[in-house]
Every structure is written in structure tokens, then in C-alpha cells.
Amino acid sequence: IVRLSQPLAEGADADAVTRLGAGGQAANVAAWVAELGGEARFVGKTADDEAGRTARAAFERYGVEVRGPVVAGRTGTVVSLVGVDGGRTMASDRGVSPDFRADELDPAWLDGCTHLHLSGYSLMRSPIDGAALRAAELAPRLSVDLSSWSAIRDFGPERFRERLEALRPAIVFANEDEERILGGPLAGTEWVLKRGPLGARFGDRELPAVAADVVDTTGAGDALAAGYLVGGPEPALEAAARCVAQLGSMP
């Protein structure tokens, strides 16, 4: 995470505060669920490199179980550029993460699972989409975060909507740009609309954001999702406020 103290200018130097740590959408949700008193397990593909070891050590600190292949290569890495106003832009190197195949998924990794939360990214890349769809078949309840309007655009909004409709998730988390490009909420699904500083809409119930001094918005939506899964709307907004008041996406 690079928190800029001044705007970037081409060819110039800008003061910044940097932090290296674990993150990623599914990883953030798992860490926040554990922080908020729930039990969490992360299932994903990582590499036997420094970034992978950092991520696995972070999960251990939070009490999150980790399952999934550990292979040669690069663990997924993201550079989050945080502007002076706390808004963020990301540059992502997915590494080995999208290479997680369905035949590598051990059904035992979902034993005891009462709820599966999928990152939308995992449904828009191959072969990880096969692993995600297989995991969804094994889970009794499913939620999906739409993840990124630009990823939906590149994948194809109609194609992505059809995939979601086939999955029939109990809950979908989206921001306004993602909702717009998808063409609106899915019928028969609990829809949580993340509205940043305006708060969130939980179905037909709209609540304001919890006041916070914004340092970094990276991971705020993931904290909100975790809070909602653990305790509902109020814990969701409280977790998001905690997240934006710190540098970094995990608790």
C-alpha cells in the first residue's frame, strides 16, 4: 500500500507512506470475520515465495485456517495507491491465484462450511472459475462480491449476470458502479449496495456510514461484507469505519 502525501506528477517524486502486508478481497473478508468473532477459512492457491509466506503468516495471526495448493511461482500481489483523500487505485499482479483448478479443490476443505463467500474475480478468470463453481456446489449458502466494474466490463456484463443467476447467491455485495454495469440487482437475492461515505443499502434499508477519519479506503468493502456476514448491517458499517481509519486492508 502506498499512501501518497501529494498528487503524483509524471517525472516527479512524491512523498508517501508505504506498508507491506497481506490482502486481497477474499483474504480480507476472512481476516475481518475472524477479527469480529467468527470462524473463517481461506481456500486459494498461493506460491512458495516471500509474498505467499507473508500471507499465510498473517492468516495464522488472525486465526484463519488456510487450505489450498502451494506451488512454485508468484503469489498474487497488488499495489494500492491511496490518494490524499483516501481514495484508492490498484495495480494487480494475480500471480498463481487464477490458476487454481477445479481438480485441485479438495472437497474436505469445505467440511463444516456454513457459508461460502466468493470474490467476483474468481468467477471471471479461468481456470479458477471452475474451482469457484465447484466450491459453490459444495457450500450450503453463498455470497458473492462483484469486485470490480472494469473486470465485469472486460468479462462481459450479460455473461457475468447469467453466471450469477445460475449460482443463485443468497447475498450479493456491490458498489454503485458495479451495480450499474451489471444492470441492477438480481431477483431473489439479498442485495447489499456499498455507497462509500454515504453508507450502505441493505435490501430496502438504507443506513448512513459510521463517522471516521479516513486514512485509506482499501478493503473497506471487504470489512463491510465480513461485518454483515457475522452480525448484520450495524456491525458491517462499524467494521468499514474501522478499516478506513487505518492504513491497510486487514484489521
Task: Indicate where each model-derived feature is located.
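Generic secondary-structure signature for well-ordered alpha-helical cores
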Residues: 2, 6, 35, 64, ...
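Conserved phosphate-binding/catalytic region of the ribokinase-like
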Residues: 14-15, 181-251
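Active-site-adjacent beta-strand anchor residues
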Residues: 23, 41-45, 172-173, 193-194
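Ribokinase/PfkB-type carbohydrate-kinase core domain
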Residues: 57-70, 82-205
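Short acidic/glycine-enriched loop/turn segments that link adjacent beta-strands
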Residues: 73-76
